[in-house]
Amino acid sequence: DPDKAEYNYVKDVDYISGAAILLSVDLWKQIGGFDERFAPAYCEDSDLAFEVRKAGYRVVYQPLSKVIHFEGVSNGTDVNGTGLKRYQVENSQKLKEKWADEFKKQCVNDGNPNPFRARERSQGKKVILVVDHYVPTFDKDAGSKTTYQYLKMFLKKGYVVKFLGDNFLHEEPYSTTLQQMGIEILYGDHWATGLWDWLKLNKDEIDVAYLNRPHIATKYVDFIKENTNIKVIYYGHDLHFLRLGREYELTGDI
């Protein structure tokens, strides 16, 4: 499902499919184009991505780039036949041999790998989960603008940033703005029902939970404290204790 949250934010990846690659002519010439050892087809796109990184550049997935790819139409799907598809197996071995040292640095596949880090090449980076009541509408209210500025700061500091809006909605143009910055937003029914299991599964991968506002923090802080070792940071935004105290004086309830 291309509309799933995990497929719709800009991120570093191992390689980009040959169905849709964009790089500058200068970089193409610097690398020397596709390595001819992979002719006539298969793995040349994977190899190109490794060459791009070797040259000091990033390989980035752009979710707003969309193409329709008819799998197998050009060369079929039989890797054991006599057609061009057979080169997929042969060239995969060539790729492993050429980049053996690089493959050793990848996430270990023990037969049941957790793709949390491998899918965005975040090995060695700190991960922060930012939770607020909804995606920051940064041109409408001060609280949202504050959250938005903190998100940008976390990115600048080198964090991998995940954002959770407690209403689990995808709100435009704000959601796409965050996703284009490289922030994964946890939205939709899947996350509304599966968030707690996700936190347990990835408790050793998330370094910090940054909780905004008292009514949001109270919903999440106990679960995080009781089920994970994630460091919790609370940001109140306002002097809520003063407001709540005055409300209690007037109404006898809060």
Region annotations inferred by a language model:
Residues D3, G81-T146, Y150-M153, P173-M181, ...:
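Non-catalytic membrane-proximal stalk/linker segments that position and tether the catalytic domains
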Residues Y7, D14-Y15, R121-Q123, E226:
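Short, flexible hinge/linker loops that cap or flank conserved catalytic cores
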Residues D1-G32, R37-A39, S46, K54-A55, ...:
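Acidic/His-rich active-site region of diverse nucleotide-sugar glycosyltransferases
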Residues A5, Y134-M153, K162-I254:
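Extended catalytic core of nucleotide-activated donor transferases of GT-like folds
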